[in-house]
Design a protein with these regions (language model features):
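Residue-level signature of outer-membrane beta-barrel architecture
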Residues: 165-167
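Short coil turns and loop connectors of transmembrane beta-barrels in diderm outer membranes
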Residues: 138, 169-171
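Periplasmic polypeptide-binding modules associated with outer-membrane biogenesis and secretion
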Residues: 1-150, 154-156, 162, 176-187
């Protein structure tokens, strides 16, 4: 009973051997290791998700990581590698994949992140090739705001214009400038 004394449970878990189909002979469960990690920085979520349909014009290698891009690499390679929470040779761990999603989600230069794993084609099915596919957000934005006020019968108006650049130095830094002007007519003076 867990409600008394130690508040602990003795639990034993028995995993049955893996079977691909019902009639197959049982085999041990595989431990998957990450083989190769690739970055694709100009992934379009509205197009086909097949890797062969992604348009790639250029690539570079940074610390053993191939980075594929279409026209111009909009993030420094160090930013991409530093936000990755797993490495080649690691055992597959879903927690590290979720941490990677969280880290890339914090970068304002990125709109979407998709991480896909494929078993290698060279006979060893316990190796996974990883593709980190990134979709950039709009890098520049301009906004205009109007505001009207009425406090104790005094009328006023304000306007502001703001400019935002999401990756000015290619590190997902956010640069923002805002200009605001206001006028209020004071009655009774």
């Amino acid at each position: 009973d867990t409600a008394r004394n130690t508040h602990q449970v003795d639990l034993t878990l028995h995993l049955l051997p893996y079977k691909t189909y019902v009639g197959d002979t049982p085999k041990e469960h595989f431990q998957y290791k990450i083989n190769k990690i690739n970055f694709i920085t100009d992934y379009d979520v509205l197009q086909s998700s097949a890797l062969s349909s992604i348009e790639i014009n250029d690539s570079l290698h940074y610390n053993g990581f191939p980075i594929y891009y279409k026209d111009k690499l909009y993030l420094r390679p160090k930013v991409l590698v530093d936000n990755l929470r797993f490495a080649s040779g690691d055992l597959y761990d879903e927690r590290n994949v979720q941490k990677t999603y969280t880290y890339f989600g914090r970068l304002s230069a990125l709109k979407y992140t998709n991480i896909r794993f494929f078993e290698t084609q060279n006979g060893d099915s316990t190796q996974l090739n990883c593709y980190v596919m990134l979709t950039k957000s709009k890098h520049k934005s301009i906004s205009f705001e109007l505001e009207g006020t009425n406090s104790a019968g005094d009328l006023g108006a304000a306007a502001s214009v703001s400019f935002q650049h999401r990756y000015l130095f290619r590190g997902s830094e956010t640069f923002m400038v805002k200009f605001r002007g206001a006028y209020e007519a004071i009655s009774g003076l």
